[in-house]
């Protein structure tokens, strides 16, 4: 029975990233619990993926939000049972897999034949690509906002309040790019304690100008909607939606640090 339930969980992950062909006849009346990041991103997942997949399979998908891989770790370590599938960036799943808190994914069920190289792993099936960018308030800078990470870190050329993520994801890369490290050498530099310290020191150099350390996409989008900061790091899609909602926000793709989002399964998930 448990293996059947695991198959159903893998099946809806497959629905999110591409079907490889499987029967859904036995899925009626089952419920799967999925958590993601909330806001416009999760709304898009729900409308475009979760609920259509649930309807096609004849199952119920219950959705909630969560705070990232630390929530998965807490759930698994405590023996709690809160969700079956979670949406995560590649780095979060890599960390969770290394800690032994995730199930290995079954790629005989999940079709990744059309994925870009490296966009799936033992613990995370990629679903979409995004970029971390430097966005600015157009009421402050007009069309002349930060066009590079060097600009974002230049508080004399671009005075004003800033926000950055309260986690290292893409922030270390941005800091090193601002510090003059060539793009092709970023991860060579970050593969040493000295390189990490260099990136952290660069972030510390503008810490007095960072008013907010954001913790979610909804939060950094709201910062720009409210005009609370003059510039922030964040995910391009969130800024696109915020602009549609009236936010005075712009960004330059030249600051883009590409990453991918996918789906993982917690170790011992009920379904």
Task: Provide a role label for each language-model segment.
Residues 1-12:
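Bacterial N-terminal signal peptides that target proteins for export
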Residues 91-95, 231-248:
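A ligand-binding cleft/hinge motif common to bilobed small-molecule-binding domains
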Residues 45, 49, 59, 147-148, ...:
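Short amphipathic alpha-helical coupling segments at ligand-binding clamshell hinges
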Residues 29-96, 221:
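Early extracytoplasmic/lumenal segment of secretory-pathway proteins
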Residues 17-27:
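C-terminal segment of classical bacterial N-terminal signal peptides
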Residues 72, 223-225, 265:
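Hydrophobic residues within well-ordered alpha-helices
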Residues 39-44, 82-83, 87-223:
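Extracytoplasmic ligand-binding site segments that recognize negatively charged/polar headgroups
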Residues 112-115, 130, 197-206, 243-269:
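Periplasmic-binding protein-like
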């Amino acid at each position: 029975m448990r293996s059947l339930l695991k198959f159903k969980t893998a099946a809806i992950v497959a629905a999110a990233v591409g079907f490889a062909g499987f029967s859904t006849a036995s899925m009626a009346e089952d419920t799967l619990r999925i958590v993601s990041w909330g806001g416009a991103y999760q709304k898009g997942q729900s409308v475009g993926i979760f609920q259509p997949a649930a309807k096609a399979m004849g199952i119920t998908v219950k959705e909630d939000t969560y705070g990232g891989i630390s929530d998965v770790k807490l759930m698994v370590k405590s023996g709690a049972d809160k969700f079956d599938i979670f949406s995560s960036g590649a780095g979060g799943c890599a960390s969770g897999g290394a800690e032994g808190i995730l199930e290995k994914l079954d790629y005989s069920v999940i079709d990744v034949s059309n994925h870009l190289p490296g966009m799936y792993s033992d613990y995370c099936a990629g679903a979409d690509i995004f970029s971390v960018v430097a966005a600015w308030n157009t009421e402050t800078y007009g069309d002349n906002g930060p066009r590079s990470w060097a600009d974002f870190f230049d508080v004399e050329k671009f005075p004003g309040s800033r926000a950055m993520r309260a986690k290292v994801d893409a922030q270390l890369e941005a800091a090193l790019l601002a510090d003059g490290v060539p793009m092709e050498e970023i991860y060579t530099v970050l593969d040493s304690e000295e390189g990490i310290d260099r990136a952290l020191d660069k972030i510390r150099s503008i810490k007095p100008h960072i008013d907010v350390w954001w913790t979610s996409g909804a939060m950094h989008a709201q910062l720009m909607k409210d005009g609370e900061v003059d510039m922030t790091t964040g995910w391009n899609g969130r800024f696109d939606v915020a602009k549609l909602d009236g936010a005075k926000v712009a960004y330059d793709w030249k600051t883009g640090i590409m990453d991918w989002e996918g789906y993982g399964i917690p170790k011992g998930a009920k379904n």
